[in-house]
Amino acid sequence: MKTSKTVAKLLFVVGALVYLVGLWISCPLLSGKGYFLGVLMTATFGNYAYLRAEKLGQLDDFFTHICQLVALITIGLLFIGVLNAPINTYEMVIYPIAFFVCLFGQMRLFRSA
């Protein structure tokens, strides 16, 4: 149990650091850095809100659909931002993977608690 929680924390932190530090170095403008930080914060908040409501047993169809809509919009914004950012091709693959690793680690961390 403790090992899975440690792995979940590690996934969350490493995913967030690779995503944020990599894009911080790659994006020359502060607005681009803020854009990618906002995308990550929106995704982690939506993920947290859904998991918390699920844990408390307060899920209904409307809330689930809102969380799915926020997730789809956030993922769309991530891919549009990555495609328009002045980064290399391999970075266009690494940063979305780090984004999803961060969200997966957050989900595993919340469910292991």
Swiss-Prot record:
Signal peptide extent: none
Gene Ontology cellular component list: plasma membrane
Keywords: Cell inner membrane, Cell membrane, Membrane, Transmembrane, Transmembrane helix
Keyword Membrane: yes
Membrane topology designation: Multi-pass membrane protein
Subcellular location: Cell inner membrane
Main location: membrane
UniProt cross-references to InterPro entries, sorted A to Z: YiaA-like, YiaAB
GO biological process, one term: DNA damage response
PROSITE patterns attached to this UniProt entry: PROKAR_LIPOPROTEIN
Cytoplasmic topology ranges: 1-9, 52-61, 106-113
A Pfam family hit: YiaAB
TM annotation in the entry: 10-20, 34-51, 62-82, 85-105
Regions of this protein lying in the Periplasmic compartment: 21-33, 83-84
NCBIfam families found in the cross-reference section: PRK11403.1
Protein's UniProt name: Inner membrane protein YiaB
